[in-house]
A protein has these predicted regions:
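Short acidic (Asp/Glu) patches
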Residues: 47-48, 62-67, 107-116
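Extreme N-terminal tail/first-helix region
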Residues: 1-17, 149
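A short beta-loop-beta micro-motif enriched in histidine and acidic residues
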Residues: 28, 48-51, 122-124
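Helix-adjacent hinge/juxtasegments
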Residues: 51-58, 62-88
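Short amphipathic alpha-helical segments and helix-helix/interface helices
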Residues: 7-8, 52, 118
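Short, solvent-exposed aromatic-acidic interface loops
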Residues: 46-50, 101-102
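Charged, gly/pro-rich active-site loop segments
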Residues: 75-153
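Short beta-strand segments
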Residues: 14-47, 63-67, 76-79
Length: 153
C-alpha cells in the first residue's frame, strides 16, 4: 500500500540516483549524482558516456532514488519517469552539484578528483536533464516500527 511523501524530502539529500535507460542490447542502469533545479533532475554525463548515447537514441528513461537508513527504520522510495534531454555542461550548476556531495568549501575538495575526474571545465561534459512526466513516492518506513511509520518522526 503506497504511502506518499513530499519528493523534496529525498531530493534535498546527497543520495545516489539510479538512471535506467534502454539500448539495443537491453536495459541498463547507472548510479549517478544529481541535483534538482528548475523543476528538473539534472544528472552528470559526458559526450562519451554510454548513458548519454543511449538517451540520444531513445530518451525514455526512469530514475529511482532511495533513502534507506536501516538502523532508523527509514525507507523512502522516489521514482521518476519521462524523456530525458542531453544538455551542454553548465559549470556553475556543476559546482552546486559538487557542493552537495563534497561540501560547500571548495578548498576542501580533493584536487586530484576535481582535476582528473570531475573536470568541471571539460567541454565534453554533459547534463542529462529529466523533467518528470510521472512521479511515484512510497514511504515504507514501517519495516521496523509497523504499522506506525518510523519517518517522519
Amino acid at each position: 500500500m503506497p504511502r506518499p511523501f513530499d519528493p523534496m524530502d529525498v531530493l534535498c539529500l546527497p543520495l545516489m540516483a539510479n538512471l535506467a535507460t534502454i539500448g539495443a542490447d537491453g536495459p541498463r542502469n547507472a548510479p549517478v549524482w544529481f541535483i534538482w533545479e528548475e523543476e528538473a533532475l539534472w544528472m552528470l554525463g559526458s559526450e562519451t558516456s554510454r548513458s548519454v548515447a543511449r538517451l540520444l537514441a531513445d530518451p525514455a528513461c526512469a530514475v529511482e532514488i532511495v533513502h534507506f537508513d536501516n538502523a532508523a527504520g527509514i525507507l523512502l522510495h522516489l521514482g521518476f519517469r519521462g524523456r530525458a534531454s542531453v544538455e551542454p555542461m553548465d559549470a556553475p550548476r556543476f559546482r552546486r552539484l559538487l557542493a552537495r556531495y563534497l561540501g560547500p568549501d571548495e578548498s576542501a575538495w580533493n584536487p586530484w578528483f576535481i582535476k582528473e575526474i570531475a573536470a568541471i571545465d571539460d567541454p565534453g561534459g554533459r547534463w542529462i536533464r529529466l523533467v518528470p512526466v510521472s512521479t511515484f513516492t512510497n514511504n515504507v518506513s514501517y519495516f521496523r516500527s509497523g504499522p506506525a511509520l518510523a519517518w517522519p518522526r
